[in-house]
Regions:
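N-terminal pre-domain/capping segments
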Residues: 1-83, 89
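Glycine/Thr-rich phosphate-binding loops of Rossmann-like dinucleotide-binding domains
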Residues: 41, 106, 198
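Glycine-enriched alpha-helix->loop->beta-strand junction motifs that scaffold or abut catalytic
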Residues: 27-29, 52-54, 92, 150-155, ...
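Hydrophobic faces of well-ordered beta-strands that scaffold small-molecule active sites
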Residues: 1-8, 31-33, 56-61, 94-98, ...
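Active-site beta-loop-alpha junctions enriched in small/polar residues
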Residues: 6-12, 34-36, 61-65, 101-103, ...
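Short amphipathic alpha-helices and their capping/turn segments at secondary-structure boundaries
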Residues: 40-52, 82-89, 142-149, 172-183
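Active-site acidic/histidine proton-transfer and metal-coordination neighborhood
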Residues: 70-156
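Acidic/histidine-rich catalytic cores of soluble enzymes
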Residues: 123-201
Length: 201
């Protein structure tokens, strides 16, 4: 295992050029940031990354922004995923971190959706890691454990703070055995926090 540190631009309000310069200066391997939506913005980011010698982790959302459009179907989310994965290839990301689907879907729907999403990524030659996040598939540890068992090749990005918020506990009880999930974590989004404030801004 090799530890590489990427600076997250989640909530970063300044220009990307500043972020890239700061990341390089601080010794980060690269940045993790939302996929720019226009070709011009992607070209601009690509030039910044190349100029600073930084790697890139692309973040994309299916079916809208952080909170998905509640009216979109799994099929529409899959079409959106495919379109954005094609666009992300322009930046040659190390991998793509995907906030996928909708937590309102049943476990069966989430399994089917994530299986199809995994196949879309495989066909396109994209390495994808699916993030644990409220309002999305993988919003709870219990659904995620079932998905991990049934989709043995699916990789995960963990921001465990979302589960701590949703479950109202640290998930450190022996009964909270997350081993099947932990063994498949590809990417960790670390946060500073405490038991009643796991998402300190």
């Amino acid at each position: 295992m090799k530890l590489e540190l990427f600076r997250s631009l989640w909530g970063y309000a300044e220009q990307r050029a500043n972020a890239c310069r700061e990341a390089r200066g601080a010794g980060f391997t690269g940045i993790e940031a939302r996929l720019p939506q226009t070709p011009a913005e992607r070209r601009e980011l690509g030039a910044l990354l190349e100029g600073e010698g930084l790697a890139y982790i692309a973040i994309l959302f299916t079916g809208g922004a952080v909170l998905p459009d509640q009216g979109l179907t799994p099929t529409e989310h899959l079409r959106d995923l495919e379109r954005q994965l094609d666009a992300s290839a322009e930046l040659e990301p190390r991998f793509v971190n995907v906030l996928a689907g909708n937590d309102r879907w049943s476990t069966t729907q989430q399994l089917d959706f994530l299986g199809q999403a995994q196949e879309i990524a495989r066909r396109g030659g994209h390495l994808c890691s699916f993030e644990t996040h409220r309002a999305r598939c993988l919003a709870t540890p219990w659904v995620t454990l079932e998905i991990a068992r049934q989709l043995p090749e699916l990789l995960f990005t963990t921001d465990i703070s979302h589960w701590v918020v949703g479950c109202e506990r640290l998930l450190d009880d022996p009964a909270d055995d997350l081993g099947d999930f932990v063994s498949r974590v590809h990417h960790i989004q670390a946060r500073v926090g405490y038991d009643q404030g796991p998402q300190v801004p």
